[in-house]
Amino acid sequence: MSEEKSRNGPARLKLVLGGATLGVVALATVAFGMKYTDQRPFCTSCHIMNPVGVTHKLSGHANISCNDCHAPHNLLAKLPFKAIAGARDVYMNTLGHPGDLILAGMETKEVVNANCKACHTMTNVEVASMEAKKYCTDCHRNVQHMRMKPISTREVADE
């Protein structure tokens, strides 16, 4: 019996080491994929997103990734959120009709608002309008992607 155990020892060790190596490679691949798909070059790889990428690059938020605003920061919330949003984007850009104007859905608005508040904590303390308006983007509609309208035609501060 001990002779049989000693023969199985190296095989078991190889199996454990192989499994651990495979696990590390899988985690590294997921981490790289998550980081890569957070960045502007990936997000603007569909032609419909090119104008958004240009305005982001020129904005005050150019140094942060798209998903610093557009996805939850919590990894367990981020994974399904990105998977669903990615599948929807692939479908709309290949089989659907995305239209000229891209509007955020309610779930995305909630995520973006939470991320605004997370980064701009000191601003939230001083802003009285936080009680009057539900979302930061109710007043700061185009802060990330720059002003789109001449001053004379704006309805909110940063259109």
From Swiss-Prot:
Keywords: Cell inner membrane, Cell membrane, Electron transport, Heme, Iron, Membrane, Metal-binding, Signal-anchor, Stress response, Transmembrane, Transmembrane helix, Transport. A menaquinol binds at residues 67, 82, 89. Heme 1 binds at residues 43, 46, 49, 89. GO terms for biological process: anaerobic respiration; denitrification pathway. One of its GO terms (molecular function) is electron transfer activity. Residues 99-100, 123-158 are annotated as: Interaction with NrfA. Its cofactor is heme. GO terms for cellular component: plasma membrane. Electron donor subunit of the cytochrome c nitrite reductase holocomplex NrfHA. Acquires electrons from the menaquinone pool and mediates their transfer to the catalytic subunit NrfA in an anaerobic respiratory process of nitrite. The other biological function of the NrfHA holocomplex is to detoxify nitrite. This function is essential for the survival of this organism as it enables it to overcome inhibition by nitrite, which is produced by other organisms living in the same environment. This is Cytochrome c nitrite reductase subunit NrfH.
